[in-house]
Amino acid sequence: LAADGIAVAAVSRSLRAGDGALAGSLEETIAQIEADGGRAVALPFDLTAPGTDRRDIIAQATEAFGHPVDIVVNNAAGPRHFDVLFPDMTWEAFHEAVQTNVWAAWDLAAAAVPGMRERGAGWILNISSSQAGPRLGPPYAENPTNGAVLYGGTKAFIDRITTGAAMELYEDNIAVNTLAPEYQVATDNALTVAGVRKDNSEPEETIAEAALALCTGDPKKLTGRIAYNLSLLVELERPVRTLDGRSTLPGWQPNEIDSARLRVPYTQTSRIL
């Protein structure tokens, strides 16, 4: 987004390096964006803290940039608990996952809608997961925790909210979509999950490019999608650039992507009617 000239308000609990369990921080992110000529502001915020008013994020971003927010990307995700079967899931774990994966996205999007209406257009993107889809079988995978009931359930919830919100906000010229990686993206967080390796994952640039397409497309045409990154890139014939936007990414251009990797044939859309 920043490489495309969009001012970015980055939100995270980790303001400085070492604040969180994973590498990276808001300060490092802002420094990288500014070094590449972009404009960004850091908003340290814990979306799960009790009593948190998430509307403050939208208000602070609006004040920082001097105009209403017109793009919201909900990328926060709560605990997966893949190792816990649904009869053993605690109420606390369920509540935390719903608060982070569903309510946080709902609150932030809803808080931004008035400003989007004021500006005459807006884009809401919720990052989803292939875990939201139905588990196919029998036969099922040998590992029963692949059911991912809690994490997948919350992502399915946000998918359905997205398509409904797209319908409700269509006349306001506000696009609402979800985007998921075709398989997995080799982020630091993903690499902590068993079986995820850099050599069997997709580069970050593919989902970043697909997200940019959904956050800048015509709200009257590109909305209500339950989209997968590679399928969307092939459908739109969209070049995949490096994160700084200066060059294209070898091996991951639409004409180089193996069709066997696609969950949705490029001649179809993943729209739910």
Regions found by a protein language model. Name each.
Residues G78-P79, W91, W123-E171, E182-V185:
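Catalytic loop of short-chain dehydrogenase/reductase
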Residues A7, P68, D159-A165, L169-P181, ...:
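Conserved Rossmann-fold SDR core element
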Residues L1-H67, P79-F82, Y266, L273:
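Short-chain dehydrogenase/reductase
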Residues T178, V196-L273:
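C-terminal helical subdomain
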Residues L22-E27, T52-R55, G78-H95, L136-P144, ...:
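Conserved mid-core segment of classical short-chain dehydrogenase/reductases
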Residues I57, V73, A104, L108-A112, ...:
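Hydrophobic positions on the long internal alpha-helix
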Residues V69-D70, P87-D107, A121, L125, ...:
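Catalytic Tyr-X3-Lys loop
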Residues T100-A121, A132, A166-M167:
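Amphipathic alpha-helical dimer-interface segment in Rossmann-like NAD(P)H-dependent oxidoreductases
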